[in-house]
Amino acid sequence: MQEQYSPRAVEAAAQQKWQKTAAFKAVEDASRPKYYALSMFPYPSGKLHMGHVRNYTITDVLARFKRLQGFNVLQPMGWDAFGLPAENAAMKNGGAPAAWTYANIEYMKTQLDSLGFALDWERELATCKPDYYRWEQWLFTRLFEKGVIYKKNGVVNWDPVDQTVLANEQVVDGRGWRSGALVEKREIPMYYFRITDYAEQLLADLDKLDGWPEQVKTMQRNWIGKSYGSDVVFPYDEASIGHAGELKVYTTRPDTLMGATYVAVAAEHPLATQAAAGNAALQAFIAECKSGSVAEADVAKMEKKGMDTGLSVIHPLTGERLPVWVANYVLWGYGEGAVMAVPAHDERDFEFANKYQLPIKQVIALASGDGEYDAANWQEWYGAKDDTVKTVNSGKYDGLGYQAAFDAIIGDLQAKSLGQKKTQYRLRDWGISRQRYWGCPIPIIHCPSCGDVPVPEKDLPVTLPENVIPDGAGSPLAKMPEFYETSCPKCGGAAKRETDTMDTFVESSWYYARYASPKCDTAMVDKQAADYWLQVDQYVGGIEHAILHLLYARFFHKLMRDEGLVSSDEPFKSLLTQGMVVCETFYRDLPNGTKDWIAPQDVILERDAKGKIVAAKHRVDGQPVVVGGIEKMSKSKNNGVDPQEFIEKYGADTARLFMMFAAPPEQSLEWSDAGVEGAFRFLKRLWKTAREHVEAGVVAPYASGELNASQKELRFKLHGTIQKVADDYGRRQQFNTAIAAVMELLNAYDKADTSGDIGRAVAQEVLEAATLLLSPIVPHVCDGIWNALKPGTELLAQAWPKVDEAALVKSEIELMVQVCGKLRGSVTVAADAAKDAIEAAALAHENVIKFMEGKPAKKIIVVPGRLVNIVV
C-alpha cells in the first residue's frame, strides 16, 4: 500500500479494473434472486450537479449492498435526452440540438464513471435515439387504433414566446416557466391519452405500494381526486336565451342545490359566445379571460372576476330563474365548462357573490343550533358536509343531515331526468402534443380522404431529422416539406405527416422497462427479460416528480401490461425520494435592483460560538456581503459546488461519504466544507489504519477460546456492528447511522489489544469486515484496502460478512451501581451471575462503601443486564 492515501491513484486503479472486467454487467440468472436498482435518469444538460451525485450515490450504495448479499443486481443508466433546453441551447449557440445533446452525454458519462457507480453501461439508452423512440411510436399506433389515444380540440396554455403548449405545471404565476411570457389560452387540435380510463386502477393500486412514502401516495391520491356527486341539469330559460336547451354542471354538493342563486360559465362556453354578440363590454371581458392560464393553481390564486350575460336558466327543483354569469375561474376544459354557485356554502362563490351583490341563500345550519349565519363574513362551518350540519330553507328537504339530503335531492333529480349520481375524478386526460422540434415525432399521417392514419409498423420509426437548428418561431418540422410530405398508407394519395412531437414525459414513462432488454429489435420489451427484472425493486429520485413522472410511469406500466408486454401491475416496488442539496447564499444588491450572487468559496465568514454566521465579506475586496440564507444549490444563486472540481481535490469517495453521512437520505443535505474535510480525514485514517496492520506482516488464524477480555469485547462490537449496518442499509435505508456505527467500531479497534498473533488475527477480522461494510459507500478506497488485506482476492466477489452469534454472547457484563438513585460506580460480573453475587459485588465497590456512609442497605434493586440500586 502507498504510505499516504491518494484518491486519484486509488480511484483510477479501481475504475480501470472494473471497466476491464465488465464488473457490473448484469445477466439474467434464474438461479439467483434479482435486485433492480434505478435512479431517475438525467437530462443531459452538460454537467452533473451535486443533486445528481446524491441521487446516484444512494442508488449505488443499495445496489452494491445487495450484491454483497448475493443478489443478481441490475443498475443501468441512460439519458432523458429530448426537451426544450436543447433547442434553447441550439438557438443560443447556433448548433443542432442533437450535436449539443450527444456531446453532453459523452461528458456526463465520464463524470458518472469518475464517481465509481456500479453501472451496466451495456444497457445505456438515450431517448432521442430512433432505436428507442421507435417503440414509443409503435405503442402510440397500437393505442390510437384501440382508442386509448384520441384527438380533440383542447384549450391549452400557449407560450407566445416559446411558441408551444405548456403543461399546467409549466405555468408559474401565469407565466411560462422558461420564457417568463404571459401565457395565453388557445384551442388547438391535440392528441390525448385516456389516462382517466385508468383513474380507478391508479388510485386503488396505490394501496399495493407499501414501499412508497405515504406523502407521495397522498399527493397522487389528491391529484387523481376521486369525488362523489351528481350531474345537475338546468334547463334554458327560453324567454332570455331564445331557444330550448340545457346547461349541465357537476357538483359534489347536491345537498346544497336549494341554495343555488346563479350559474357561472367559462369564457368559451356557447352561452357566453351568444351573449357577447353585440355586447362590446362582454366581448372585452371574454378576451381578457382567454389570455390567462388554464392551470388550476393559477386560477385558484387570481382575482375572481365575472360579468352578467343577461341570460337565465331554470332551477331544476324550484323552477326559479337563475342568472348566467361568465367567470374567469371556470375552465372550459374541465367538465362541462359550467358550475352552479351556492354562495352561502362555497367560499369562492361567497366572495364572488359579495363582490357583485348576488343573492346568498343559507341552506345549511349547525345541527346543534349554535352559530348564526353572517353573509358578510365566511366561517368554516358554512362549507361543512358531515353530521354537524342539517338543511334549512330547503322546503321538503329541511332538517336532513348531509348524506340524507344528498340522497334525497339526487333521487328527485333522477326522477325528473334532470340529474344523475356520478363519481368523478379531478384527473384529466393527458394531452401529449407539443409544437416542438426536439422530441419524438407523432406517428400519424393526415390524409384528406382517410383522415388520421397511424404509420404502419413496417415504416417505423418516423425518424426525426437531426441536422436542424430551430429559430424559436414554431416547429421547424412544419417548415420542412421533406419531412411532412408523404403518401397515405391506406389510399396512396398525397398526405401530410403530423409535425407535432410528443411530450417528453412519454419517453420517461417507460425507460425503466426498456433497460431489461435495451438491444431488443423485435419488441418494445423482451417479455422474458422483463419478467425476470421487473418490477424495479428500488427507485430513487426527487419528490418533485411525485405526481407527473411517477403517475405517468404507473399509467404506462398498465398500458404495457394490457398489451402483454409486462406481467406486473406496478413499475416500482419501493421508492426513495432524496432531499435536496442546499448551501448558503450570498449577494450584493446592484443599482438596477437585481442581485449579484457571490459563490460561497469567495466569501470569508465570521461565526459566533454556536456556529451562526455573524458577518460575511468578499474574499477579494474585503467588503461586506449579504447573507441570503440556505437554499437549493443552483446556477441562478451561484451557490453550487462543481462535482468535477471536488473530485479532483478530494476524490469521489470523499464526495460519496460526505453525501451519505451528512443527513438521512430523505432530508435536505446542507453543504459543509468542514463536513467534507472531516470525511476526507476519516478516509485517510482508514487507509493509515489498514496500512499499519498490513505492514506488520502475515496474520495467523486463531481459536476463539484464546481471546483475552479486550479482544472479546472488540469482536462483540464487530458483530453487533455487522448486524446494525445490514439493518441500516437494508430495512432502514439510513446510511449516516451505518457510517457512524463503523466509525465507532474503528474507535473501539484503536483502543483494543491487537498485539500478538491473536490480537492481529482479531484486527484482520475487524478490518476485513469494516472494509466490506463501508464498500457500498466508498468503493474505491475499500477496493484498495481489500487488495492489501487479502491479496489475490477481489472485494466484488465477497459476500456480506456473517454475524458470529457466539461473539454476541458476553461472558461478563458491566452493571451501573447507584446509591439512592445516584450513579456511584460500575461492577463487572459474570453474564449468568446470580442475584446474590451481583449484590455482593456492588456492596464491595469502594465508591459505593464511601457513599453508604456505614449505613445498612434497606433494599437492593437489581435490573438484569443494566444496573444495581442500593437504598440505605
Curated annotation (Swiss-Prot):
Sequence motif: 'HIGH' region, positions: 42-52
Highest taxon of source: Bacteria
Annotated positions binding ATP: K635
Its EC number(s): 6.1.1.4
Pfam families per the UniProt record, alphabetical: Anticodon_1, tRNA-synt_1, tRNA-synt_1_2, tRNA-synt_1g
Location of the motif 'KMSKS' region: 632-636
Keyword tRNA processing part of the UniProt annotation: no
Transmembrane parts of this sequence: none
Gene Ontology terms describing biological process: leucyl-tRNA aminoacylation
GO molecular function, one term: leucine-tRNA ligase activity
PANTHER family noted in UniProt: LEUCINE--TRNA LIGASE, MITOCHONDRIAL (PTHR43740:SF2), LEUCYL-TRNA SYNTHETASE (PTHR43740)
Similarity section: Belongs to the class-I aminoacyl-tRNA synthetase family.
Protein name: Leucine--tRNA ligase
